[in-house]
């Protein structure tokens, strides 16, 4: 049996909960509880209330999600630019 595809969504962190969990409101208005992915935890990426994030949702349980990316305001897509000397 093949694995089901994950649903990718964008949302806004409303509240920081204990045990590295977050209350997130998706762009479509749906609210859920999300946790940080292992790579974000490993690299000590901090998530605060008000951050824009990308999430993965399972099609079986839409009340829980995994945060996979934190969008930084003012930085567009693409590789980081090195300052010129």
UniProtKB/Swiss-Prot annotation:
InterPro entries: NA-bd_OB-fold, RNA-binding_domain_S1_IF1, TIF_IF1
Location (main, coarse): cytoplasm
Key words, A-Z: Cytoplasm, Initiation factor, Protein biosynthesis, RNA-binding, rRNA-binding
CDD domains in the cross-refs: S1_IF1
One cellular component term from this protein's GO annotations in UniProt: cytosol
One Pfam family this sequence matches: eIF-1a
GO terms of molecular function: ribosome binding; rRNA binding; translation initiation factor activity
Domain (S1-like): residue spans on this chain: 1-72
Quaternary assembly: Component of the 30S ribosomal translation pre-initiation complex which assembles on the 30S ribosome in the order IF-2 and IF-3, IF-1 and N-formylmethionyl-tRNA(fMet); mRNA recruitment can occur at any time during PIC assembly.
Function: One of the essential components for the initiation of protein synthesis. Stabilizes the binding of IF-2 and IF-3 on the 30S subunit to which N-formylmethionyl-tRNA(fMet) subsequently binds. Helps modulate mRNA selection, yielding the 30S pre-initiation complex (PIC). Upon addition of the 50S ribosomal subunit IF-1, IF-2 and IF-3 are released leaving the mature 70S translation initiation complex.
PANTHER family found in the cross-reference section: TRANSLATION INITIATION FACTOR IF-1, CHLOROPLASTIC (PTHR33370:SF1)
Similarity remark: Belongs to the IF-1 family.
Identification of the protein by name: Translation initiation factor IF-1 2
